[in-house]
Regions:
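C-terminal accessory/regulatory regions appended to core domains
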Residues: 1-175
Length: 175
């Protein structure tokens, strides 16, 4: 059996994790598997250390981001959070998405960085609420279908935050 990303870092397979422990264990694995430590080692040992370093990096990137961590946890439960065939979202969330996109466009057209900053704060609050919800749904209730919808919302929020930051950066660069 293959080791899960959580096991690799000595963490319990939960949504709410100790990020400091994740960081420390990642750095420890990276240090132990660094290529400089295997300069004189046999080719097989070099390859194994490189594979471990690559796995640790992939696992770390997955677990440090809440949306990726939720998606991975759902996959461990046999649930595909981002299925090509499952793109439905609640109507109220779809309406909210359109309102957020309009607000971004309006602020961009008005070159209103303050409005974009406020929208970013709103999105971060929404993200925090979804993270709390995911912790309850996954860790406490084991309600994976509901966690799937919440994960998809969080992925959308993350994308919107990235888009807002890009717009802010462009506006700041043009000033």
């Amino acid at each position: 059996m293959t080791q899960s990303y959580f096991e690799l870092f000595g963490l319990e397979a939960k949504f709410k994790i100790d990020l400091a422990k994740l960081e420390n264990n990642f750095r420890k694995i990276q240090s132990e598997s660094h290529p400089d430590r295997f300069v004189t080692a046999a080719a097989a040992k070099k390859l194994k250390s490189m594979q471990l370093a690559t796995l640790a990096n992939e696992a770390y990137q997955t677990l440090k981001q809440p949306a990726n961590r939720a998606k991975y946890l759902l996959e461990l439960q046999g649930v595909e959070a981002i299925a090509e065939t499952n793109t439905s979202m609640p109507a109220d969330f779809l309406m909210q998405q359109m309102e957020w996109r309009e607000a971004i466009d309006d602020a961009k057209n008005a070159k209103d960085i303050a409005a974009l900053d406020n929208l970013l704060i709103t999105m971060q609050r929404e993200s925090d609420e979804l993270n709390t919800e995911l912790s309850l749904l996954i860790d406490n209730n084991h309600d994976y279908p509901a966690a799937t919808n919440t994960t998809r919302k969080l992925i959308f929020i993350d994308k919107v935050c990235i888009d807002i930051k890009k717009v802010i950066e462009k506006l700041e660069d043009s000033n």
